[in-house]
Design a protein with these regions (language model features):
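Short helix-loop-beta connector
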Residues: 160-165, 228
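C-terminal substrate-recognition regions of SAM-dependent nucleic acid methyltransferases
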Residues: 6-17, 22-29, 34-37, 41-50, ...
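Class I S-adenosyl-L-methionine
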Residues: 221-231, 239-386
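Feature marking protein-protein/ligand interface regions
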Residues: 1-161
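Glycine-rich, N-terminal phosphate-binding loop of Rossmann-like dinucleotide-binding domains
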Residues: 236
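Short, well-ordered alpha-helices that flank and scaffold nucleotide-derived cofactor binding pockets
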Residues: 179-183, 203, 263-266, 295, ...
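Glycine-rich, phosphate-binding/catalytic loops in enzymes
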Residues: 156, 184, 206-207, 248-252, ...
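SAM cofactor-binding core of SAM-dependent methyltransferases
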Residues: 167-220
Length: 400
C-alpha cells in the first residue's frame, strides 16, 4: 500500500466520524490533539485530560504550525471502542521528542484507523502486538525491497519446518534465553553455578517447557569434547560491563567468563555462537571489550553480526536494552552472501521499516511505577526476557 492510500483512508474515516457528531457526547476518550500530514493540519477533538496521557510529540513540516499529538488514542463511538495509531516511531515514545524527516515520511503509514476492541484489556500492558505481514517477511529474512510476485503469492507468515540444531546452553539462569531459543534450538546441556537457577531449570524440564538435558554447575569444569552440539548460546555475566557497576571489563572476575564460553565453542567445534549481554558492553572501556570479543571470534574462525533489542519493543512491559551476537564459523558461510542483516538493527534508533511505509508493530506503553511489574522484576532479577531473545533470534537465526 502506498503512503497516499493510508493518508486518504485516514482522512475519509476522520471526516465520517466528525460528520456523525463525534465531537459531541458520543466521544468519551480521545487522547489525541491532532497531527500534520503533508503540510495540512488535521484537527482532532481535544483530549480528556483526566485520562492517562502518553508523551506528546511535536512535528513541523512545510511551514505548517506545529501541533501536538500522542502516540495512541482510544475513541468510544456507537457503543464500540476504536483505536487510532499515531506512533511517530516504533520505538520508545520518550526517545524522539521531534520527528525526523524520515519519520515524517513514514507518518501516514503509522496513523491507522483500526477497529480493535480494547474494553477487555484496559491496561496497555495486557494488549497483544499487531504484526504486519510485511514485517513478518522481514523477520523471516526476506529483503526489505522484495517484490517478486510469485513469492508474494505465498503467505509470508506461514511456518515452514526447520530442523532444531543442538545447543549447549551456558549461564542458563532461570531459562530466559533457553525459552527464547526453544523454537530454533534443542538444548543438550545446561550450565549455571547458581543452585536456585538450577532448581528452576529442573522444574521447567519437568513441566516440559524446556528440553530435558544434564545441568552442569561450574563452567570452568565443563568438558564440551564429550557433548555433541552445533551451537553454543549464553548470556555471560554482565556485572563488569554494566553501567550500574564499576565497568572493569574483562579485567574483572565475572564478565571474563566470556572466554570460557569461547573455550567450550572450540571444544565442540560449534557451527554458531549466540551471546547476550547488556548494551553497555558496546562502549565499555572505550569500546575495548567489544574489540576483544571481535578479535576472539575472528581469531577462532568466526564471523559475526549483532543486534540491539529493547525488551519493550518485543512486547515486554519493561525497559531493558540487550545486545545479541551471532557468530558463524567462517568455513560454513557461502562466499556470495553477507552474514546476518542487511542493515544494523537497533530497535531504539532503527525501527523496523520497509521501503514502502506500512504499519509495522504496535508498541506497548511501558508504565513506570507499576507495582505489580516492579515486584515481578525484583523477583526474577537481571535476566533476559524470552520475548526479547526470540525477537533477536528471529532476525539472526535465518543465517543458519
Amino acid at each position: 500500500m502506498s503512503q497516499n492510500y493510508y493518508l486518504t483512508k485516514i482522512q475519509e474515516e476522520f471526516a465520517q466520524l466528525h460528520a456523525d457528531g463525534l465531537k459531541k457526547a458520543n466521544c468519551k476518550k480521545i487522547p489525541l490533539y491532532g497531527c500534520v500530514l503533508n503540510g495540512e493540519l488535521m484537527e482532532m477533538p481535544k483530549p480528556d485530560l483526566t485520562l492517562r496521557d502518553p508523551v506528546n510529540f511535536v512535528m513541523k513540516k512545510d511551514g505548517a504550525v506545529a501541533s501536538k499529538f500522542v502516540k495512541t488514542g482510544l475513541v468510544d463511538y456507537e457503543e464500540k471502542t476504536f483505536r487510532y495509531y499515531a506512533t511517530p516511531r516504533a520505538g520508545n515514545p520518550h526517545a524522539c521528542k521531534s520527528l525526523t524527516k524520515r519519520s515524517q515520511n513514514d507518518l501516514a503509514s503509522q496513523l491507522r484507523y483500526d477497529k480493535v476492541y480494547v474494553e477487555k484489556y484496559p491496561d496497555p500492558a495486557d494488549r497483544g502486538m499487531v504484526v504486519h505481514p510485511r514485517f513478518g517477511e522481514y523477520m523471516q529474512g526476506f529483503p526489505r525491497d522484495w517484490t517478486d510476485p510469485e513469492v508474494a503469492m505465498v503467505n509470508p507468515l506461514k511456518v515452514y519446518p526447520h530442523p532444531r540444531l543442538k545447543a549447549i546452553d551456558l549461564f542458563s539462569g532461570i531459562g530466559g534465553l533457553t525459552l527464547a531459543a526453544d523454537k530454533f534450538l534443542e538444548s543438550v546441556a545446561y550450565c549455571d553455578i547458581d543452585a536456585d537457577a538450577r532448581a528452576v531449570l529442573n522444574a521447567r524440564m519437568k513441566d516440559g517447557s524446556i528440553d530435558t538435558a544434564p545441568i552442569y554447575e561450574d563452567i570452568k569444569k565443563l568438558d564440551a569434547t564429550k557433548i555433541e552440539a552445533d551451537v553454543v548460546i549464553g548470556g555471560f555475566p554482565c556485572q563488569d560491563l554494566s553501567t550500574m557497576g564499576k565497568r572493569k571489563g574483562f579485567e574483572g572476575q565475572k564478565s571474563v567468563l566470556f572466554y570460557e564460553a569461547m573455550r567450550i565453542a572450540k571444544e565442540c567445534n560449534a557451527k554458531a555462537i549466540i551471546l547476550e549481554n547488556v548494551k553497555g558492553l558496546l562502549n565499555c572501556g572505550g569500546n575495548e571489550v567489544f574489540f576483544q570479543i571481535r578479535d576472539e571470534l575472528s581469531s577462532n574462525g568466526y564471523d559475526y553480526k549483532y543486534v540491539v533489542v529493547e525488551a519493550a519493543h518485543a512486547g515486554a512491559v519493561h525497559h531493558r536494552a540487550r545486545v545479541f551476537f551471532l557468530a558463524l564459523r567462517r568455513d560454513l558461510i557461502p562466499k556470495d552472501i553477507e552474514l546476518g542483516l542487511r542493515t544494523p538493527l537497533d530497535t531504539k534508533h532503527n525501527p523496523f521499516w520497509t521501503e514502502q511505509p506500512i504499519p509495522a508493530v504496535e508498541e506497548r506503553m511501558v508504565m513506570k511505577g507499576n507495582k505489580k511489574a516492579d515486584a515481578r522484576m525484583k523477583q526474577i532479577g537481571n535476566v533476559v526476557c524470552p520475548l526479547q531473545g526470540e525477537l533477536a533470534m528471529r532476525v539472526l537465526i535465518p543465517s543458519l
